[in-house]
Amino acid sequence: MSTGLAGILFLASLVIALVAVHVPLGDYMYRVYNTAKDSRAENVVYRLIGADPKAEQTWGAYARSVLAFSAVSLLFLFILQLVQGRLPSALTDPGTPMTPALAWNTAVSFVTNTNWQAYSGESTHGHLVQMAGLAVQNFVSAAVGMAVAIALVRGFARKRTGELGNFWVDLVRGTIRILLPISVIAAILLITGGAIQNFHNYDQVVNTLAGAQQTIPGGPVASQEAIKDLGTNGGGFYNVNSAHPFENPTTWTNWIEIFLLLVIAFSLPRTFGRMVGNKKQGYAIVGVQAVLAVISWSATLFFQLQAHGTVPTAVGAAMEGVEQRFGVANSAVFAASTTLTSTGSVDSFHDSYTSLGGLVLLFNMQLGEVAPGGVGAGLYGILILAVITVFVAGLMVGRTPEYLGKKITPREIKLAATYFLVTPLIVLTGTAVAMAMPGQRAGMLNTGPHGLSEVLYAFTSAANNNGSAFAGITVNTEWYNTALGLAMVFGRFLPIILALALAGSLAQQGKTPPSIGTLPTHRPQFVGMVAGVTLILVALTFLPMLALGPLAEGIH
């Protein structure tokens, strides 16, 4: 079987599985967020944190709760890393010293669901920090994104109210009822497939067949691996992430991991359709995501299977940076999926991809990661794109734009437009400043177009809360730790505030009945329009920088 055909079959099986769970998982999440009943475990948590599960919040109160919870989480994780040497299960001789700048960067990274790692995981953090710090944030940062998405959907579904639900209820339910059960099942499957789960020390030394000695780092890997992918977090227990055989041993576990990082994001549109009372609207949204995802998967496979140059021609594909047990096609599907979502985990070395293959990965993130995007973040991103699309359509026919019975007034379009200006501003400003500083340019291992691509990739990944890297620059410096940390903070929380403000504005409106001039937003025409607007927005914003980086390298 050819490599290309194997990749197509691998991808087809993945799509079939995602289609199969779309309805049941989407309906289950609808019930989770719309029931009035709380479990005993949830009531215990509410009492511990002092939350009233019956109280509703305005968009401002909801946003303040998100920010307060995230700030406390950041402070806890920051301190935990700095004092880890005094804690049980700490590493006796960490490979990477934990400086305040690195602790800040790492804490921000995991709290914002980015999981950018400027350190080697297995030689920096002990088991306690991995479990009580990083793994916990993998759960709750994903639950925060889902909560914000549900709040925005309530803004469309409700009328003449200022209330969007209760953040603490949405956070707890998303964690306990959705993320925890699926993660337990996924961890068992990964252990069955060969991923490790133990509490062995880092300093296990074994004798190899060649007579040398090798250190084998153990740890509770499978449990963290499951939520790493399911919550679109991406931070690996090991430095090489899912390319490590202890995290991702076989093609079977590789398939499971790709499925996990896509499954919730592709099922949330069904939840959206149920909540607004029109399932066809959910199908339209997932249709947009599917169109963009198929384009990305196809383009990545095409560019990575091209045989240009002596070595690629000899082996039939671009094999540099690819794990042999996965092959080019499966690695390309993983790379496209991890950048289409906000996951950022890797099973191959993105910096070694062909210039145009790397361009696709960059472009995936620059889409705003809406195809399907991160857990929760992808849904609220694509819904705001839908708002912009109906506004553009309204301009063309001279009517006040409407979406799901809500008028898109100047206030709504200002919020939506600002939402999509935030991330490009962070990315382009950060890249420009880094390239203008001689000290930061000295940390680049490559010059020319590829060096620019590496810096652009770093800020694109940080601002879009992805976390993957081209890895050709030295980022464990005070400047990069601080700058990328700020990019992650602003790239996460400014869009969340704008999305919640939009939700509050929409919830206060009444419902406008559809008329003969209303744009149908459940048909293929609308799917094509949203996909087109998305691609045009990204092209207009980033094309000059892409032309100087990966495009110039590809042409050369």
From Swiss-Prot:
Membrane-spanning ranges: 5-25, 65-85, 133-153, 176-196, 249-269, 283-303, 377-397, 415-435, 483-503, 526-546
A GO cellular-component term linked to this record: plasma membrane
The UniProt record lists the keyword Transmembrane helix: yes
Topology in membrane: Multi-pass membrane protein
Molecular function as annotated in GO: P-type potassium transmembrane transporter activity; potassium ion binding
Cell location: Cell membrane
Pfam families assigned: KdpA
Disulfide bridges in this chain: none
UniProt KW keywords: Cell membrane, Ion transport, Membrane, Potassium, Potassium transport, Transmembrane, Transmembrane helix, Transport
InterPro entries in alphabetical order: KdpA
Record note on quaternary structure: The system is composed of three essential subunits: KdpA, KdpB and KdpC.
Functional summary from the UniProt entry: Part of the high-affinity ATP-driven potassium transport (or Kdp) system, which catalyzes the hydrolysis of ATP coupled with the electrogenic transport of potassium into the cytoplasm. This subunit binds the extracellular potassium ions and delivers the ions to the membrane domain of KdpB through an intramembrane tunnel.
Assigned protein family: Belongs to the KdpA family.
PANTHER family per UniProt: POTASSIUM-TRANSPORTING ATPASE A CHAIN, POTASSIUM-TRANSPORTING ATPASE POTASSIUM-BINDING SUBUNIT
Protein name: Potassium-transporting ATPase potassium-binding subunit
